[in-house]
């Protein structure tokens, strides 16, 4: 290789860009594999009793600093006491992580993200609501399809697999994953 070209390629800015792109490709590949396994049911689940209230509180803590970057405020409503569910902790964490990441990317900057945990008729219910920064001109079913994003202009990074993975992982654990859209209100 020509020394001049090699010298240019080895500049820190080029290396940083190459590193970022390779990390993005790695993440996309991992997401594709996980989406495929989750939707086909080919994931081994390690079911255990999990306190959903505690897990969501921990998730709030994990994302709080990140949300502050976009001036998003988490407003939570939790019951007194625990809500124990039978789930795979790692897979359930991934569902929550995907939902919180979705809120971080697409919620209107400076707005609130509402997170509720409740028990209704013996069922644990997790709800997240936020106002979308851009109009949601897409159906809830389309949002959970692979490679579909609410940000049609694609101004944010992402593979369009997050909600699809979250839905598949929830269903794999015998849960329900429901999204509703009312104007620019997103609710999962």
Regions found by a protein language model. Give the residues of each.
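Short alpha-helical segment of the dimerization/phosphotransfer core of two-component systems
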Residues: 20-25
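Conserved micro-motifs of the catalytic ATP-binding
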Residues: 40-45, 84-87
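Conserved catalytic submotifs in the C-terminal HATPase_c
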Residues: 46-50, 68, 73-83
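Short helix-loop "hinge" at the ATP-lid/N-box region of the Bergerat-fold HATPase_c
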Residues: 103-104
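Short beta-strand/loop element within the Bergerat-fold HATPase_c
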Residues: 110-122
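Short conserved segment of the HATPase_c
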Residues: 135-148
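Glycine-rich ATP-binding loops of the HATPase_c
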Residues: 174-182
